[in-house]
Regions:
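Active-site-proximal alpha-helix that buttresses catalytic centers in soluble enzyme cores
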Residues: 1-250
Length: 250
């Protein structure tokens, strides 16, 4: 008897930048490759956006769920490709899943941990920094919600970096000036974003401007996380909520 398919829906925030959906599809292909190594069942790994999509997320879940049920599938796993536990992860995605679940009574729609919660995320970020740089800045979007930036502060402390934010203080320029006041000569900057987009382009321009303003200082900016094999590896591990000693490799 053929095995029933297993389905995963990777959910991004959504962006008007065409690079984002393209990178999401690339990541989905890599995740499918990782997961296929540990199962003989047919795998469906697809993508969706919470915002700026052609259809609402709950409708996208229903569409995939209906197809899955027609092929004998019983479980659909939603994997939030979010780096922080903000309102989208806590409230918006669960609300969309609840709407879809009400229309899919024979299907178990599960929400996996969000990407940024992976215990090995810090190790991945550590490898992204240029080791030749003496000082580090981790740049995130930032939140105005009370306590909303605590996760970034914790990650930055783990990495030995200063946290900076795009939308709130302290900004990248402010943190760079603070480091320069200590006499540092080399600064590594890591944008904590999943894919390249308008904000990461603007951060790159800021880094260029800072380098022009401080020609004797060495600046290095890493790429966003991207649709790499390493990121796909983390997503594949989260998709089945494994215990730390049961992580699959790919």
């Amino acid at each position: 008897m053929p095995l029933s398919p297993v389905a995963y829906l990777l959910v991004t925030h959504g962006s008007r930048d065409p690079r984002s959906p393209w990178m999401a599809r690339q990541l989905a292909e890599r995740v499918q490759y990782c997961l296929q190594a540990s199962t003989a069942a047919p795998l469906w790994v697809e993508t969706a956006s919470l915002e700026l999509a052609d259809v609402p997320l709950h409708q996208r879940i229903q569409q995939l769920g209906d197809r899955l049920c027609c092929h004998g599938g019983t479980v659909l796993q939603i994997v939030p490709l979010f780096l922080l536990p903000g309102v989208h992860v806590r409230d918006d995605i669960p609300a969309e899943v609840a709407i879809a679940q009400a229309h899919l009574p024979t299907l178990d729609v599960q929400i996996c941990p969000y990407l940024g919660s992976h215990p090995h995320m810090g190790q991945l970020l550590q490898r992204s920094f240029d080791p030749r740089m003496g000082s580090r800045v981790l740049v995130s979007h930032g939140s105005r919600r009370a306590g909303g930036n605590a996760p970034i502060e914790a990650i930055a402390a783990q990495l030995g970096a200063l946290p900076a934010y795009w939308s709130v203080a302290p900004s990248l320029a402010q943190q760079v000036e603070q480091l320069l006041s200590t006499g540092t000569q080399a600064i590594a900057i890591l944008p904590y974003f999943l894919f390249a987009g308008g904000i990461t382009d603007a951060i790159a321009q800021q880094v260029h401007d800072l380098a022009q303003r401080h020609p004797t200082i060495q600046f290095s900016m890493a790429e966003p996380l991207g649709a790499t094999a390493e990121v796909a590896h983390l997503v594949a591990q989260l998709s089945d909520r494994p215990a730390p000693d049961r992580y699959v490799s790919c």
